[in-house]
A protein has these predicted regions:
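P-loop NTP-binding core
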Residues: 1-4, 8-204
Length: 204
């Protein structure tokens, strides 16, 4: 109970599905302007998350699809990055610019930053175009960066339920989108175990 009061005071909400959330709204877009003249503006989020260390085993930072100061803050605070890319032309084209930003943040601000992989999302396998984009991304980046085997399928209903404050697991736990995220979770956990095994081996 004491911990719940502590996190509530920080604007963190406990969701019935078993996770804590710090939700944002449209007002967050104004932070881009506010951060322009802020001291250590690239690491403000990291400084805040440092105060939460020990309370959580994992913290996920969901970024808006832009390369502004908020995204830079997220990259400066993170140790791993999963890059979601819609199976469409423009998002795929913008991937190279995002990768350049990630590498720049790694060089200048956060040397521990690593890319876990690229995740294909909103994939409509009924169209040849989506299949071609997916194949192109795997061919272009697969030799340098892991492209997750999991693909998150397109779902109109998945978009709608986010407005209801529910997750896909609460709405349709046996559906294709939920199955996709379950498979992604397994891939990420496997990566974590491989890293842990590698660290243990290097210590020995």
């Amino acid at each position: 109970r004491q911990r719940q009061m502590r996190i509530r005071d920080r604007g963190i909400l406990h969701h019935p599905e078993g996770v804590d959330l710090m939700p944002a709204d449209i007002q967050l877009s104004g932070m881009e302007v506010s951060l322009v003249n802020a001291m250590s503006r690239e690491t403000i989020l990291r400084q805040y998350l440092d105060t939460l260390k020990g309370q959580y085993s994992h913290i996920l930072i969901d970024c808006q699809p832009s390369l502004g100061m908020l995204t830079v803050n997220a990259l400066a605070a993170a140790n791993r990055v999963i890059i979601p890319v819609q199976a469409e032309y423009l998002p795929a084209k913008g991937l190279e610019q995002l990768l350049q930003t990630v590498n720049k943040v790694k060089r200048q601000i956060n040397p521990k930053l690593q890319i876990d992989g690229i995740l294909l999302t909103m994939v409509d396998n009924r169209t040849n175009f989506a299949k071609e984009i997916a194949a192109l991304l795997r061919e272009t980046y697969g030799s340098k960066i892991k492209v997750f085997g999991t693909e998150i399928p397109h779902s109109v209903r998945a978009k709608e339920i986010s407005a209801e404050g529910k997750s896909i697991f609460a709405h349709d736990p046996n559906g294709k989108v939920a199955e996709g995220y379950k498979n992604l979770t397994k891939e990420v956990i496997k990566l974590e175990k491989q890293r842990e095994k590698s660290r243990t081996g290097s210590i020995r």
